[in-house]
C-alpha cells in the first residue's frame, strides 16, 4: 500500500477548531514535513490549491500558498519522494500547466504529477472575474475532459490542435516534454467525476468515512470500478484519512474530543453555504460530504483515532478493499504526527513491511 501526505498549504491544516494547533503555512514548514515524509519512506506528497478560505474565528484557509511554486521548491530539496501539485483549471490554461509540469518534472528528475480540480467554491473565482456562471456546476467535467486532452497531447506528442467547445488549440507546442510519464489525479466523486477519472486520470482520491471505520469508503471505490469497466483503464483509488494518535487509545480519544469541542461554527457555516450553491452536480460530490454537519471539525474526512497500534491495524484494513492503491494522510500536528507515524505506526503495519525492510537494509 502506498502512503502519501496531504501537506498543509493552508493555515491550520484540516481542523476547523479553536482547540487545534493554530499555524500559518510556509515553505519552511512544508519542507520539514516533506523531508520527514521522505525520511520515513513515504511515497508521495500532495498540495491542494485554495484561493479563498472559510473565515470564522480561526480564519480557516484564509491564508494559503500556491501549489505549483511550492512543489517546485520542494522538488529542489528532495531526492526520492513523488510530488503532486494541484491545478485550478479555471485559472490556468492547459498549455501553461503542461509547461509548468514539465519544468517541475525536470527539477525533480521525473518525480512530479498533477491533481486536476474543476472548482466548486464560486467566491474563489468570482473575486478574480473568472467564474463562468452557475451553469458551470453541471458542465465541470466536460470542461475538464477537454483540458485533460490538451495536457495529454502536449505531454505525449509535444503538440495539440484540439478544437473543442472550451479550448481551441492551434499548433500549440511543448518542449521539452516530461522525462517520466505524467500521472493525473482527480478527486471527483459525482457520476461525471467518476467517468472523467476512469477515462483520463491514473488515480482517484476519495474521502474516508466515519471514525475508526477504515473500510466504509468501499462503495465509492465500487462506483469507480464500475466506471473503469467501461473504459478498461487501470485506475486505483487513494483514500484520505486524518490520523490522531497517542500512546493509548484513551489519550488519542481525549485529543479528538478536545478538537471537536472547539469547532469553528462560523467557518463551517460558510462551507455549508458554498456547498449549497451547487444545485446541479448531484448528491454524491465531495462538497456534499465536506458540508455534512456530522463531523464538521475536520470537514467529514475519515478519521483514525487511537494508539499507535490501533491506527496501524486500522490502516492495514484499508487496503483490504479491492481497487485501493493507498492512503493520503493528514495529521493534527504534522511534524510530531509524521515522526510518530514513521517510528511507531508504520513499523507495525503489515502493508508497509516492504518499506521498513528497505529502511533497515539502508541502515545496515
From Swiss-Prot:
Keywords: Flavoprotein, FMN, Monooxygenase, NADP, Oxidoreductase. It catalyses: uracil + FMNH2 + NADH + O2 = (Z)-3-ureidoacrylate + FMN + NAD(+) + H2O + H(+); thymine + FMNH2 + NADH + O2 = (Z)-2-methylureidoacrylate + FMN + NAD(+) + H2O + H(+). Its EC number is 1.14.99.46. GO terms for biological process: alkanesulfonate catabolic process; nitrogen utilization; uracil catabolic process. It comes from the Bacteria. FMN binds at residues 49-50, 115, 124, 140-141, 190. GO terms for molecular function: alkanesulfonate monooxygenase activity; uracil oxygenase activity. InterPro entries: Luciferase-like_dom, Luciferase-like_sf, Pyrimidine_monooxygenase_RutA, SsuD_RutA_monooxygenase. CDD domains: Alkanesulfonate_monoxygenase (cd01094). Belongs to the NtaA/SnaA/DszA monooxygenase family. RutA subfamily. This is Pyrimidine monooxygenase RutA.
Amino acid at each position: 500500500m502506498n502512503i502519501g501526505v496531504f501537506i498543509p498549504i493552508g493555515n491550520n491544516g484540516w481542523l476547523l477548531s479553536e482547540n487545534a494547533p493554530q499555524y500559518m503555512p510556509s515553505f519552511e514548514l512544508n519542507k520539514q514535513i516533506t523531508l520527514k515524509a521522505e525520511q520515513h519512506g513515504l511515497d508521495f506528497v500532495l498540495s491542494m490549491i485554495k484561493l479563498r478560505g472559510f473565515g470564522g474565528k480561526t480564519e480557516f484557509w484564509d491564508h494559503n500558498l500556491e501549489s505549483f511554486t511550492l512543489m517546485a521548491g520542494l522538488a529542489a530539496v528532495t531526492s526520492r519522494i513523488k510530488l503532486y501539485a494541484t491545478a485550478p483549471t479555471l485559472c490556468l490554461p492547459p498549455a501553461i500547466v503542461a509547461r509548468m509540469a514539465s519544468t517541475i518534472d525536470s527539477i525533480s528528475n521525473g518525480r512530479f504529477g498533477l491533481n486536476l480540480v474543476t472548482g466548486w467554491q464560486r467566491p474563489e473565482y468570482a473575486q478574480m472575474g473568472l467564474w463562468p456562471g452557475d451553469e458551470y456546476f453541471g458542465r465541470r467535467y466536460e470542461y475538464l475532459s477537454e483540458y485533460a486532452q490538451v495536457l495529454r497531447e502536449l505531454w505525449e506528442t509535444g503538440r495539440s490542435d484540439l478544437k473543442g467547445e472550451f479550448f481551441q488549440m492551434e499548433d500549440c507546442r511543448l518542449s521539452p516534454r516530461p522525462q517520466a510519464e505524467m500521472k493525473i489525479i482527480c478527486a471527483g466523486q459525482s457520476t461525471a467525476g467518476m467517468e472523467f477519472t476512469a477515462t483520463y486520470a491514473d488515480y482517484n482520491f476519495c474521502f474516508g468515512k466515519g471514525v475508526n471505520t477504515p473500510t466504509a469508503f468501499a462503495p465509492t471505490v465500487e462506483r469507480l470500478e464500475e466506471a473503469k469497466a467501461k473504459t478498461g483503464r487501470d485506475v486505483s483509488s487513494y483514500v484520505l484519512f486524518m490520523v490522531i494518535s497517542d500512546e493509548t487509545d484513551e489519550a488519542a480519544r481525549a485529543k479528538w474530543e478536545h478538537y471537536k469541542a472547539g469547532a469553528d461554527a462560523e467557518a463551517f457555516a460558510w462551507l455549508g453555504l458554498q456547498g449549497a450553491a451547487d444545485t446541479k452536480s448531484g448528491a454524491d460530490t465531495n462538497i456534499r460530504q465536506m458540508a455534512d454537519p456530522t463531523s464538521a471539525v475536520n470537514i467529514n474526512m475519515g478519521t483514525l483515532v487511537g494508539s499507535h497500534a490501533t491506527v496501524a491495524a486500522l490502516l492495514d484494513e484499508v487496503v483490504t478493499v479491492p481497487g485501493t492503491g493507498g492512503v493520503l494522510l493528514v495529521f493534527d500536528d504534522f511534524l510530531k504526527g509524521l515522526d510518530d507515524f514513521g517510528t511507531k505506526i508504520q513499523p507495525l503495519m503489515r502493508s508497509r513491511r516492504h518499506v521498513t525492510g528497505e529502511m533497515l537494509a539502508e541502515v545496515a
